[in-house]
Design a protein with these regions (language model features):
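Periplasmic/cell-envelope proteins involved in peptidoglycan metabolism and beta-lactam response
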Residues: 1-184, 191, 200, 276-284, ...
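Beta-lactam-recognizing serine transpeptidase/beta-lactamase-like catalytic domain environment
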Residues: 61-62, 163-204, 210-446, 465, ...
Length: 470
């Protein structure tokens, strides 16, 4: 009897080892198969379609499904206009939009980064081939609204929660439907370009938020400085001048200059600051630094002052660089800058992924708010807020005024040469809503429009303030 029990114990042990080895082999083979399919996919739409046939879902923070797999087919938001508005963020399974959730979160959606024990548990439960589900920080209603606001423009909208860094809406125009990308038809010029993340725009007068912060924190400069604005006359040889107000603003101090967006004042201020100090404050706000959004890549905003002379420095100080100088900003970064001012000078790390869960509902990732850059002192941010409120209430940003809302912001216009060699003027607005219940920062860039960014931004904030945001 004892011999029988020993034999039974040995047989049981061998069986357990055999099953463990078999499961390990299955895990390795499954992982290898996924990797081989991914490597072989390249531009092969049909291979990618197979890979994504069991991929996890992508949902908005308010529970609307933006992408999911159903009976071996990858499907996108049921509301076609929402699917269109979400194209640049969600992407599609063909990876023609390489900087999208479908591509940069591929491992999570396919579940290919799981450990052996995690995969074993799912295999035993019968859902080992299913990917993980992702919940994004964006709100479906805000995404849809942003898409509608951009319908008649070329440009971008970014809306953030400035206390958490959560991305609430991101939209670009032009755009197309996901199925058009999959079928590769009806693709209009520029419709696949993610302007919000990849756009390198001249900041125009929105850069004056940075030069003002530098002035407020410069102990040797007089914040009560006055400058006589002579309109279209250059402040120094080859230097900044008024392009939209040729008659000039007269003698102005900081508040009036900020309200009227006076190039003469801020050109003189840039010269007084000098390249090193101007550059340092810009870098405090994230220029020449990496800005991340989860797994997404974002174009680095640049402030590279190579052109010699005071004239070039004065133009850089008003966001319209000349010669070898480079000053660019992405809409995503512009919204984060506005949010930093709203958040007492602290820029929060931007988030796009709220939560990741496996097929059994276990939470694998949950977003935590994190401070990113200390941009300026809290008292500097408070003074900037007063100046930005003045811009909206009685200055260049009056189009952003809305009854019952306290909106602070800064307008910008930037001249650029298009592909046809013609001068176009882009319209920019960066601002935020002063509200405990809706801490919202927004950036709008409209190409070839010199006025409407403030209107679009305020419409976005007004709508966002009217709904409950999870």
């Amino acid at each position: 009897m004892k011999q029988f029990l020993r034999n039974l114990k040995m047989a049981t042990t061998l069986l357990v080892l055999f099953v463990a080895v078999l499961l390990a082999a299955l895990f390795v083979q499954q992982k290898r198969s996924t990797e081989e399919l991914s490597a072989a996919a390249g531009e092969n739409k049909y291979t990618l379609q197979q890979i994504y046939s069991r991929a996890g879902s992508i949902s908005s923070s308010d529970g609307v499904v933006l992408a999911h797999s159903d009976e071996g087919e990858r499907k996108y938001a049921e509301n076609s206009e929402l699917a269109r508005a979400c194209l640049h963020l969600v992407g599609d399974y063909t990876h023609r939009l390489t900087n999208s959730v479908e591509s940069v979160y591929m491992q999570e959606l396919l579940g290919s980064s799981r450990s052996f024990l995690e995969q074993l548990k799912l295999d035993l439960s019968g859902c080992g081939f299913e990917g993980n589900d992702l919940t994004l920080t964006v709100n479906s209603n805000l995404m849809l609204k942003a898409g509608k606001l951009l319908k008649n423009y070329r440009g971008s909208i970014v809306l953030l929660n400035y206390e958490t860094g959560d991305l609430l809406a991101l939209a670009n125009s032009p755009t197309v439907y996901p199925q058009d990308v999959i079928n590769w038809e009806n693709i209009t010029d520029g419709s696949l370009f993610n302007r919000a993340l990849y756009g390198r725009y001249l900041p125009g007068s929105t850069i004056k938020m940075i030069t003002t912060a530098a002035l407020l924190e410069a102990p040797d400069l007089d914040i009560d400085m006055k400058v006589k604005c002579l309109g279209s006359k250059e402040i120094v040889p080859a230097g900044a001048r008024e392009t939209l107000t040729p008659e000039g603003h007269g003698t102005v101090g900081l508040q009036e200059a900020f309200r009227k967006s006076c190039n003469a004042f801020f050109g003189k201020l840039a010269i007084a600051l000098g390249r090193e100090r101007f550059n340092e404050k810009a870098e405090n706000f994230g220029f020449n630094q990496d800005l991340v959004l989860g797994n997404f890549k974002i174009a680095q905003s640049r402030l590279d002052l190579q052109e010699p002379g005071q004239g070039a420095l004065s133009w850089a100080g008003v966001g319209q660089p000349i010669g070898q100088d480079k000053v660019t900003v992405s809409p995503m970064h512009l919204a984060a800058i506005a949010g930093a001012i709203a958040n007492d000078g602290v820029m929060m790390k931007p988030n796009v992924l709220l939560q990741e869960t496996d097929p059994l509902g276990a939470v694998k990732y949950s977003r935590e708010a994190e401070e990113y850059y200390s941009c300026c002192r809290s008292d500097t941010a408070a003074e900037l807020e007063e100046l930005m409120l003045d811009v909206v209430n009685s200055g260049t940003g009056k189009r952003a005024r809305r009854d019952g809302l306290k909106i602070a912001g800064k307008t910008g216009t930037a001249e650029m040469t298009n592909d046809d060699g013609k001068i176009e003027v882009n319209s920019l607005f960066a601002g935020y809503l002063i509200s405990d219940s809706h801490p919202l920062a927004v950036a709008v860039v409209l190409e070839g429009e010199n006025r409407d960014a403030a209107t679009v931004a305020a419409d976005m904030l007004q709508y966002a303030a009217s709904i409950a945001i999870p």
